[in-house]
């Protein structure tokens, strides 16, 4: 097993999703694009691909960039639906960061003539 496969396959969100203190008291928006998300369809086992758009206004914590990359990559061998993967990412980040505002958009590549976009926005909940 290559080192990249090993670190992704052994990623534990509870201990490996590194969170840093936010050193700035002003409000600001962090935007990330994660274009290489993949997981497996829970029904067929076929791969699903998406771009994950994350934006948040931090409170006291921010997520370390390599850690969010590894977390997103840890989905690649999991059988999980579009809805469940987007909601899991949102729930984990909301719990760990406790941001003032957060929005996740999971924009899945079309498969079988269906294009799915899942959006979870704390300002609309």
UniProtKB/Swiss-Prot annotation:
Pfam families according to UniProt: QueF
Catalytic site: 41, 48
Example GO biological process: tRNA modification
The enzyme's E.C. designation: 1.7.1.13
Name of encoding gene: queF
Stated name of the protein: NADPH-dependent 7-cyano-7-deazaguanine reductase
Compartments reported by the entry: Cytoplasm
Residues at which substrate binds: 63-65, 82-83
Family, similarity comment: Belongs to the GTP cyclohydrolase I family. QueF type 1 subfamily.
Annotated source species: Sulfurimonas denitrificans (strain ATCC 33889 / DSM 1251) (Thiomicrospira denitrificans (strain ATCC 33889 / DSM 1251))
NCBIfam families the record matches: QueF-II (TIGR03139)
Catalytic reaction annotation: 7-aminomethyl-7-carbaguanine + 2 NADP(+) = 7-cyano-7-deazaguanine + 2 NADPH + 3 H(+)
Pathway(s) annotated for this protein in UniProt: tRNA modification; tRNA-queuosine biosynthesis
GO molecular function: preQ1 synthase activity
Chief location: cytoplasm
């Amino acid at each position: 097993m290559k080192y990249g496969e090993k670190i992704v396959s052994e990623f534990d969100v509870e201990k490996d999703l590194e969170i840093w203190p936010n050193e700035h008291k002003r409000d600001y928006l962090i935007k990330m694009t994660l274009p290489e998300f993949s997981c497996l369809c829970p029904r067929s086992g076929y791969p699903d691909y998406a771009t994950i758009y994350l934006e948040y206004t931090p409170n006291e914590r921010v997520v370390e960039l390599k850690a969010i990359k590894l977390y997103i990559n840890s989905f690649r061998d999991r059988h999980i639906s579009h809805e469940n993967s987007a909601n899991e990412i949102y729930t984990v980040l909301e719990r760990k960061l406790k941001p003032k505002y957060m929005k996740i958009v999971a924009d899945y590549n079309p498969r079988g003539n269906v294009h799915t976009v899942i959006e979870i926005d704390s300002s609309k909940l």
